[in-house]
């Protein structure tokens, strides 16, 4: 049962000793903006030396997988492979490739509310995008991702496509907002998806955390035993809920969005799926449970 206990000492050594692997969120866990969380690169290196598998799960849909891998390298996270990185953009591309499979002349196109990184991920999966050069096939899906150019006219166009009951509505994630370095907030994909849902009267299929579909994408590529895997994240409503839904041990790090007070409030309210099993001040604290 999740009790939001501080992970340290003997409990930390026991939890890490039993774990085969760790899933990490990225923003607010490994870095904040362009600043890495102190000790994060060293932790990943020590986990690798200890034989622990590490994978990374992000709701950020702004970067295609190769670009995300470059970001890891640029920030000083050495030795990681692109195959270890799972974003909501990648998972959306996989889902749409599955759902829109068929003859080339019948596969249809995806209308994208999102940036170039998301579009690149879709193209890499062999999907056709509405508005790309050439004759536009019928739009068979609307995909909502993080879109800094979101507008009333684009919303109207998306709703026009969604009047077709066979047109899919997919969202990369439901994160309502994201923190900025100055303490302010910027709207997240969840805010944009809510606008499309309200205007179209349709319900989006969400692929990112806390949807188990992201874990399904991971298990297609890696052998992962959720009972022996840690999910480490900074957001209770996405990372921790995702971990619970997929049967993992959950660890909240306090370097990002959610606070210990929020976790304790969920515990008091009996909303245990939003309560982590453990918390740490920073993921660097996990190094105390690893042998040198």
Swiss-Prot record:
Tissue specificity statement from the Swiss-Prot or TrEMBL entry: Ubiquitous. highly expressed in brain (at protein level).
Gene Ontology cellular component list: actin cytoskeleton; cell-cell junction; cleavage furrow; contractile ring; cytosol; glutamatergic synapse; lamellipodium membrane; midbody
Active site per UniProt: 25 (nucleophile), 27 (proton donor)
Transmembrane segments: none
Pfam families in the record: Hydrolase_6, Hydrolase_like
Binding residues for Mg(2+): 25, 27, 234
NCBIfam families registered for this protein in UniProt: HAD-SF-IIA, PGP_euk
Purpose: Functions as a pyridoxal phosphate (PLP) phosphatase, which also catalyzes the dephosphorylation of pyridoxine 5'-phosphate (PNP) and pyridoxamine 5'-phosphate (PMP), with order of substrate preference PLP > PNP > PMP and therefore plays a role in vitamin B6 metabolism. Also functions as a protein serine phosphatase that specifically dephosphorylates 'Ser-3' in proteins of the actin-depolymerizing factor (ADF)/cofilin family like CFL1 and DSTN. Thereby, regulates cofilin-dependent actin cytoskeleton reorganization, being required for normal progress through mitosis and normal cytokinesis.
Family, per entry: Belongs to the HAD-like hydrolase superfamily.
Protein name (Swiss-Prot/TrEMBL): Chronophin
Organism of derivation: Mus musculus
């Amino acid at each position: 049962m999740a009790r939001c206990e501080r992970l340290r000492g003997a409990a930390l050594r026991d939890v890490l000793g039993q774990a085969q692997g760790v899933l990490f969120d990225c923003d607010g866990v490994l870095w904040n903006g362009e600043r890495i969380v102190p000790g994060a690169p060293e932790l990943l290196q020590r986990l690798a030396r200890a034989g622990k598998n590490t994978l990374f799960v992000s709701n950020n849909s702004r970067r295609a997988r190769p670009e995300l891998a470059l970001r890891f390298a640029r920030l000083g996270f050495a030795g990681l492979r692109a195959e270890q990185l799972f974003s909501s953009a990648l998972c959306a591309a996989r889902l749409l490739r599955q759902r829109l499979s068929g003859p080339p002349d019948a596969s249809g196109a995806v209308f994208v509310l999102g940036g170039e990184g998301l579009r690149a991920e879709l193209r890499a999966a062999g999907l056709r995008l509405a508005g790309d050069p050439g004759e536009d096939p019928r739009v068979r899906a609307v995909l909502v991702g993080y879109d800094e150019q979101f507008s009333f006219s684009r919303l109207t166009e998306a709703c026009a496509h969604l009047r077709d009951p066979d047109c899919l509505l997919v969202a990369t994630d439901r994160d309502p907002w994201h923190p900025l370095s100055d303490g302010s907030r910027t709207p997240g994909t969840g805010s944009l998806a809510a606008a499309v849902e309200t205007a179209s009267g349709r319900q989006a299929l969400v692929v990112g955390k806390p949807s188990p579909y992201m874990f399904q994408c991971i298990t297609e590529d890696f052998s992962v035993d959720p009972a022996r895997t840690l999910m480490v994240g900074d957001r209770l409503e996405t990372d921790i809920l995702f971990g619970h839904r997929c049967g993992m041990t959950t660890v909240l790090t306090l370097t990002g969005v959610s606070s210990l007070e929020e976790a304790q409030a969920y515990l008091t309210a009996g909303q245990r799926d939003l309560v982590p099993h453990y918390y740490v001040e920073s993921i660097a604290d996990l190094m105390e449970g690893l042998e040198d």
